[in-house]
């Protein structure tokens, strides 16, 4: 092998003092420019961060990125870097295996070389003298392919002429071909205007300026003739390996590289930035911790079948010598039922294998020769129209039916059978498939027949599961439940909830899980991490606990505290650098809590010129709802789009900063929302106690004046003293003994006749007639007469009758007068009763009419109240809609996961399980595009909603400060009226204000004066009202009065109410018609203006129609409902006024009766009654004493009788035994 002509000298250290820098010997005065193109390899094969990457391009197999950042796998891990000043004009060979790394500049790696990069390092338009005559690629198949370019189109006979690949700027187009033995196999295209880098991969890819010009079989070595020309150009040859890195591209060239090789660099790669600002950043789930894999299958006795497919290829040459696969190639299936055209799998398992043969022909179609050289080909089966790849059939794909056929009759899909040559793939036949989806047949990589239960379970931990064909990530837990049927159980949305293990009959629950963490980065270093699990991560070993998460940090919590001590007891004194809500992280990694300070804004009164001042009011309570906050949402974009699939994550990086923009928008919105809400709201302990029923009922939380509030009636029944009479000094009532000793007669009396009569008689019956009373001019006496009065008048009547003949009839006059007076009393009582009856009948009828009308109004009021409650229900429904808006948006976002966006499946893992990698990438790209669109719509809706809520929150804060904490002077700000006070209460996602206001019902119009212009001896001065809230006016009595503008309360103005100003001059501002639009601008329709502009510049542009299922923002608007409630409240108020009038009418129907007094008269018993009572007492008392004291065995009579009986009785009685009861049967 020819060696490179390289002369190296050791120069002073450029990139540190660890590795010397090798510079070519002929770098005279241009050494500085050479140093910019040569770097010292850092340990690990990394390129220094300050390297300029002059003429280093991003290798791509598709479109070229012009500008941007992306995370990709590129050959940027340098195993060896050779600075080369010039080449010999003989062929030089470079091999991927066994390369000599003795002349490397800097560190040397022994990794596998993937790509050899040839860089021509120059910054100006340098033109090479000759360049490479030809690039020879020695493939692993023993075939040598040559790549060369020509300055014009050539024929077959011209390929032997001179060709080259010039480096630097080329003159005119150069047409390039792939040659084999001097014969063109493929036309590659034209060279770019300036060739600056050639990179060749061991996998057979040939790149020029980063673009893949040609691909072939794997390559062992590269050989080419090269000269540097007349200019002083400089070469570097880099032996590189693929590694994952964040690459910044400008004008298609690499300008900066960040290796994704460390924890902090991985975060830089995920955020697509080389410099991280101080803050919190999400950590990849792979760095948080890995999960085990669980598989649950049905145990069964398995049988296995091997399906061998033999494909015989026929190859021949074209007119240009290129290989062509014949359509006469044949496919042979295993024999089944004497038929080779269709083969169906009849076992539980199967494995498919392809065997390929190749025959060639020169001129005819009889393929007998072996395929050699360029005609050598291998049969491959490509995906075709089937939703699964042929090479994935043995990867545990399941079917209910699976058949292979050579005929399209009855087929569901087909595979393409192709001949793979050294240059391309050519489809020759089709292999048709008849299948049914199911679980009866499974393709396996090897024979696994027999009785098996291949289930593997990892319980009580986050695991990646495949349960009866349903995949996901969750926690599997054993339960004690018993369900009679079913293998697995899902929710209505299709999520797996649990399953039954048929081997032991145990039911397991499945709970979705996702381990997440946030890294705290300060000055580009990870100082801490917030995580949901207690596990070391990101190289952090010290940790502490909080009520909501674990915190790992570089701060050593174990110095003075116990490891894992709660954060509240650590008392770290430091200044936080980054904050989130009420927590912060210091530069040393310590976690601290932040004290939130509150500040109130200044409130300025508003001056008004209204001279119509209210004189009467009605009180109204008006309700206002204001939304204060929304629930923050954080979405892991890569998890939502790819669900952790590594291949999908690689594809997702091609979308540059899509995920970063989505996550940062939501994160910043959530942080701003959290900070503003936290600074606005705080918890009051007293209010929290009053919110509890137990604490509210406790007298400890109430004002001391209520602690000793007496019970009703005082202690026990002490209050009855206010109900029962306590003074009887005037003897208005008789005692209980008097009620017993006298007969009480109750009658009805006229007015005060009876009381005046009693007071006149003084209890003497003889004064009965003398004390006669007069009622309406008629003489009357009480109708009840006692025995003495009856005796007296009887004697008068008897005396008159007896002495009548003798002229003594006048004695009966008192009797006649008394009888007539008592008859008058009875007659007048009857007349009063008749009048009262008429009054009662008329009043009752009128009352019934008023009551009927009143209840009719009450009925209408109740109806209005019912409709008012319906309006309140609608308002509450809107509040509920505000609460559910975000949930509905998230639900819509989740539903999008079930949409396949025209892919064959919505499951990424299922797509890669069924298709080959290239076809699966195309299908997954559709899912990524659709899901990113759904995420963008959701983020737009969320940000719009947050902006609306942010303005609403500021309004709520202003209303709390002005309406609740003070009394607002602004008319209409705290309710529609003059504000009295307001109460605020919590509501879903916001606050409800109850504004108590005065609504004017009558007004007084006055002529207001802005001030008084006064005249002194030698000067004129002005006086204006000191309090601008007062209105100055002059009344008819020529006195000045002041009244508040909110209520008409005039008072005489005094000198203390005024302040003096300089003069009385008034400045008038005159405006013309031309100046008026600048003062009062015309209404401008912004939408129409924008539409006109767009139509002028883009006449064919149309407004896109965004359906609500993509973007749906809900705005809270309770104005209509509140106005409706106020209208109904006003109507109810008017109804109550009418009811008050009707009640007054009912009150006017109160019957003012002439009461017949209830007269109680006590009549004394006659003398003979008292005599009879005395005789009974005299007789009964001695008899009772005798009976009690003398009788009985202990009495006097009893003792005397016993003595006499014992003395005079001679008969002695014998003692007898007591008689017992005898039963006779």
From Swiss-Prot:
Residues 13-552, 17-552 are annotated as: S1. Residues 1081-1178 are annotated as: Heptad repeat 2 (HR2). Residues 1187-1225 are intravirion. Gene3D superfamilies: 1.20.5.300, 2.60.40.3130. CDD domains: TGEV-like_Spike_SD1-2_S1-S2_S2. A motif (KxHxx) lies at residues 1221-1225. Residues 798-819 are annotated as: Fusion peptide. One of its GO terms (cellular component) is membrane. InterPro entries: ALPHA_CORONA_SPIKE, CoV_S1_C, S2_sf_CoV, Spike_S1_CoV, Spike_S2_CoV, Spike_S2_CoV_C, Spike_S2_CoV_HR1, Spike_S2_CoV_HR2. This is Spike glycoprotein. It comes from Porcine respiratory coronavirus (strain RM4). The lineage of its organism: Viruses, Riboviria, Orthornavirae, Pisuviricota, Pisoniviricetes.
């Amino acid at each position: 092998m020819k060696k490179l002509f390289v002369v190296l000298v050791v120069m002073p250290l450029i990139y540190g003092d660890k590795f010397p820098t090798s510079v070519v010997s002929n770098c005279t005065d241009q050494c500085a420019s050479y140093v910019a193109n040569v770097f010292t390899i850092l340990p690990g094969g990394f390129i220094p961060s300050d390297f300029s990457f002059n003429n280093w391009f991003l290798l791509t197999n598709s479109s070229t990125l012009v500008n941007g950042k992306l995370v990709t796998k590129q050959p940027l891990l340098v195993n060896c870097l050779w600075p080369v000043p010039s080449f010999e004009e003989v062929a030089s060979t470079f091999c991927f295996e066994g390369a000599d790394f003795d002349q490397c500049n800097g560190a040397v790696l022994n990794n596998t070389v993937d790509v050899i990069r040839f860089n021509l390092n120059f910054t100006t338009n340098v033109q090479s003298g000759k360049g490479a005559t030809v690039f020879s690629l020695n493939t692993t198949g023993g075939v040598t392919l040559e790549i060369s370019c020509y300055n014009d189109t050539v024929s077959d006979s011209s390929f032997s002429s001179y060709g080259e690949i010039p480096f630097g700027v080329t003159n005119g187009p150069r047409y390039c071909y792939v040659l084999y033995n001097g014969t063109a196999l493929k036309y590659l295209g034209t060279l770019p205007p300036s060739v600056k880098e050639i990179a060749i991969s061991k996998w057979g890819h040939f790149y020029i300026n980063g673009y893949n010009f040609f691909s072939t079989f794997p390559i062992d070595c590269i050989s080419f003739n090269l000269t540097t020309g007349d200019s002083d150009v400089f070469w570097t040859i880099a032996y590189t390996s693929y590694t994952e890195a964040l690459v910044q591209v400008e004008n298609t060239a690499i300008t900066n590289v960040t290796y994704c090789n460390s924890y902090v660099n991985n975060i830089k790669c995920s955020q697509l930035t080389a410099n991280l600002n101080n803050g919190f950043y999400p950590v990849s789930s792979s760095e948080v911790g890995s999960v085990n894999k669980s598989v649950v299958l049905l145990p069964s006795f398995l049988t296995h079948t091997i399906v061998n497919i033999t494909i015989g290829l026929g190859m021949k040459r074209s007119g240009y010598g290129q290989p062509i696969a014949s359509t006469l190639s044949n496919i042979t299936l295993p024999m089944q039922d004497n038929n080779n055209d269709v083969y169906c799998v009849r076992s539980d398992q199967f494995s498919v294998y392809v065997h390929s043969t190749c025959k060639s022909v020169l001129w005819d179609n009889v393929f007998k020769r072996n395929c050699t050289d360029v005609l050598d080909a291998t049969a491959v089966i490509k995906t075709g129209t089937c939703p699964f790849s042929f090479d994935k059939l043995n990867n545990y794909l399941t079917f209910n039916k699976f058949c292979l056929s050579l005929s399209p009759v009855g087929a569901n899909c087909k595979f393409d059978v192709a001949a793979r040559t050294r240059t391309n793939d050519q489809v020759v036949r089709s292999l048709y498939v008849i299948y049914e989806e199911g679980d009866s047949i499974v393709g396996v990589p090897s024979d696994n027949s027999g009785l098996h239960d291949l289930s593997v379970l990892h319980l009580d931990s986050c695991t990646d599961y495949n349960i009866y064909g349903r995949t996901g990530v969750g926690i599997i837990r054993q339960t004690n439940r018993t369900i009679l049927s079913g293998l697995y159980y899902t929710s209505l949305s299709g999520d797996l909830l649990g399953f039954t293990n048929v081997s032991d009959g145990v039911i397991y629950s499945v709970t979705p899980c996702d381990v997440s963490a946030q890294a705290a980065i300060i000055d580009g270093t990870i100082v801490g991490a917030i995580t949901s699990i207690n596990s070391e991560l990101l190289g952090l070993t010290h940790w502490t606990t909080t009520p909501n998460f674990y915190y790992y940090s570089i701060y050593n919590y174990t110095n003075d505290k116990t490891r894992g001590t709660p954060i509240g007891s650590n008392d770290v004194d430091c200044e936080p650098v980054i904050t989130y809500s009420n927590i912060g992280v210091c530069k040393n990694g310590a976690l601290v809590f932040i004290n939130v300070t509150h500040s109130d804004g200044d409130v300025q009164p508003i001056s008004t010129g209204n001279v119509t001042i209210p004189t009467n009011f009605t009180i109204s309570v008006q309700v206002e709802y204001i939304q204060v906050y929304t629930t923050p949402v954080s979405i892991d974009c890569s998890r939502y789009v790819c669900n952790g699939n590594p291949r999908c994550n690689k594809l997702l990086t091609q979308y540059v900063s899509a995920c970063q923009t989505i996550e940062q928008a939501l994160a910043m919105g959530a942080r701003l929302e959290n900070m503003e809400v936290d600074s606005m709201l705080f918890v009051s302990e007293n209010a929290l106690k009053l919110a509890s029923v137990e604490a509210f009922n406790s007298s400890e939380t109430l004002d001391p004046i209520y602690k000793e509030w007496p019970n009703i009636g005082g202690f026990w029944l002490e209050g009855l003293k206010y109900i029962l009479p306590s003074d009887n000094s005037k003897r208005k009532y008789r005692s209980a003994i008097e009620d017993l000793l006298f007969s009480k007669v109750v009658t009805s009396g006229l007015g005060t006749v009876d009381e005046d009569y009693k007071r006149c008689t003084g209890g003497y019956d003889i004064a009965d007639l003398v004390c006669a009373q007069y009622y309406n001019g008629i003489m009357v006496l009480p109708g009840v007469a006692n025995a003495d009065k009856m005796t007296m008048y009887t004697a008068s009547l008897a005396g008159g009758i007896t002495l009548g003949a003798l002229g003594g009839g006048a004695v009966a006059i008192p009797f006649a007068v008394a009888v007539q007076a008592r008859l008058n009393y009875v007659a007048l009582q009857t007349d009063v009763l008749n009048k009262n009856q008429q009054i009662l009948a008329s009043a009752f009828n009128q009352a019934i009419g008023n009551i009927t009308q009143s209840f009719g109004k009450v009925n209408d009021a109740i109806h209005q109240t019912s409709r008012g409650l319906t309006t309140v229900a609608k308002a509450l429904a809107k509040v509920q809609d505000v609460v559910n808006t975000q949930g509905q948006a998230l639900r819509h976002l989740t539903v999008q996961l079930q949409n396949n966006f025209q892919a064959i499946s919505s499951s990424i893992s299922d797509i890669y399980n069924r298709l080959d990698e290239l076809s699966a990438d195309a299908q997954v790209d559709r899912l990524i595009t659709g899901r990113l669109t759904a995420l963008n719509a959701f983020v737009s809706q969320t940000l719009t909603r947050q902006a609306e809520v942010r303005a609403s929150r500021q309004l709520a804060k202003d209303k709390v400060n002005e309406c609740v904490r003070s009394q607002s002077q602004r008319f209409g700000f705290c309710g529609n009226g003059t504000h009295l006070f307001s109460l605020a209460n919590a509501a879903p996602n916001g606050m409800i204000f109850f504004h108590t206001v005065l609504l004017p019902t009558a007004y007084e119009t006055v002529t207001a004066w802005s001030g008084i212009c006064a005249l002194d001896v030698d000067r004129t001065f002005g006086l204006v009202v000191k309090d601008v809230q007062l209105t100055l006016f002059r009344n008819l009595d020529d006195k000045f009065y002041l009244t508040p503008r909110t209520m008409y309360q005039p008072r005489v103005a005094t000198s203390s109410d005024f302040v003096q100003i300089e003069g009385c001059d008034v400045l008038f501002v005159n405006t013309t018609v031309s100046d008026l639009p600048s003062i009062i601008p015309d209404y401008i329709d912004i939408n129409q203006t924008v539409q006109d502009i767009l139509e002028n510049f883009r006449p064919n542009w149309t407004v896109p129609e965004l359906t609500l299922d993509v973007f749906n923002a809900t705005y809270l608007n309770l104005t209509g409902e509140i106005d409706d409630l106020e209208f109904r409240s006003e109507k109810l108020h008017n109804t109550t006024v009418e009811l008050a009038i009707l009640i007054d009418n009912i009150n006017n129907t109160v019957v003012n009766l002439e009461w017949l007094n209830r007269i109680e008269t006590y009549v004394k018993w006659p003398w003979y009654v008292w005599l009879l009572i005395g005789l009974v007492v005299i007789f009964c008392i001695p008899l009772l004493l005798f009976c009690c004291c003398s009788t009985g065995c202990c009495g006097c009579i009893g003792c005397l009788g016993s003595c006499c009986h014992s003395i005079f009785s001679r008969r002695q009685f014998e003692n007898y035994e007591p008689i017992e009861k005898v039963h006779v049967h």
